[in-house]
Amino acid sequence: MSDFIFTSESVTEGHPDKICDQISDAVLDALLTEDPESRVACETVVNTGLCLLTGEITSKAKVDYIKLVRNVIKEIGYEGYRAGGFDANSCAVLVALDEQSPDISQGVNEADDVNDDLEDNTGAGDQGIMFGYACDETPELMPLPISLAHRLAIQLSKVRHENMLNYLLPDGKTQVSIDYKNGVPLSINTILISTQHNPEIDGITNEEEIRQRIKEDLWKNVVLPATEDLEIKPNIQTTRFLVNPTGKFVVGGPQGDAGLTGRKIIVDTYGGYARHGGGAFSGKDPTKVDRSAAYAARYVAKSIVKAKLAKKAEVQLSYAIGVAKPISILVETFDTGVISQANLTELINKYFDLRPAAIIKEFDLRNLPQKMGGTFFRKTASYGHFGRRDLDLPWEKVEEKAAQLAEASKVFL
């Protein structure tokens, strides 16, 4: 199918599930900042007036979890009259954390395929499959639908934080549908923005008048600024623009919906444009291959596309708990590759070390929170873990690897 419409969504940091992702990753940041060897699997639940921290943590760090949770919620914007029914200062915070299972710890500490190589001594923290993807649709080598959905969500949040539209509240979602012709993005078919807001705007109380006001404001202050540097831009005449289709969005955040860590895994990755192994990222330390190997898979896929060895590349990795080396490596280029997939796999095996300890070392994952002033992983917990133009992410820096692949591939051409 070469002509189609593809749709992806994003959410703001005030979405209930994203509140949870940020809290879980803020816990991870705090623990790794004090103790880079911390083992963390932190889950968060939010509901009306309640935040629950649970999971397994083994660490020498001392963290005031209740204070941390309240600070994250406050920074997102849920405080006082702008809280929308969920207040950082008054919500109950419950902490129910255990230590990591010794059975899991044993597998990570001493791999089944152990030898004299230090990187072989750290096994994967669990079994699983991870996918990485890249394509040439955007400068950051991401699919256009998810890239644009994130741009809109980021701008929506910026407008709220800067009080440009003082009636906006923290919860919000964006969705973008792109027209493809011969498999290439052609135009923006539909933009959908749902944003929480005050029940009254500048004295306006009529539901339809409020929705029309928000629609006009968002087109001017969110859609146009978010797309001004794109080759494919929205057109007020041809792009369908939907805002709060139910009519109003006053009740939102945890008051409107319960939130849970790890429920926005498609938003976190490629917007459904590529496959997903099912594992979430937030609240997990780097020994969890759900996170670290997914970063590595993106690193490999982006290096392939950056090297112009394919227009699209999807990399699957699989691991067994307690085993360092991947069980399998698969690359798919969707008939866009300039060399065979077998040759690409050969290059991957030669130029990328995909054992957990090697990935952690390559990206310095254990030390990044400390180096970044105590906050690193939390910043990835909203607006995607890949293709971020606003963050300095080591798995996005592929120039050196791409150059190696481009040179090495010449023997296959």
Swiss-Prot record:
GO MF, one example: ATP binding
EC number: 2.5.1.6
Location of this chain's protein in the cell: Cytoplasm
Reaction it catalyzes: L-methionine + ATP + H2O = S-adenosyl-L-methionine + phosphate + diphosphate
Nucleotide-binding found in the keyword field: yes
Acetylation is among the record's keywords: no
Pathway: Amino-acid biosynthesis; S-adenosyl-L-methionine biosynthesis; S-adenosyl-L-methionine from L-methionine: step 1/1
Cofactor note: Binds 2 divalent ions per subunit.
Residues that bind L-methionine: 56, 100, 257, 288
Known function: Catalyzes the formation of S-adenosylmethionine (AdoMet) from methionine and ATP. The overall synthetic reaction is composed of two sequential steps, AdoMet formation and the subsequent tripolyphosphate hydrolysis which occurs prior to release of AdoMet from the enzyme.
Record's subunit section: Homotetramer; dimer of dimers.
Name of this chain's protein: S-adenosylmethionine synthase
Species, as recorded: Prochlorococcus marinus (strain AS9601)
Gene transcribed to yield this protein: metK
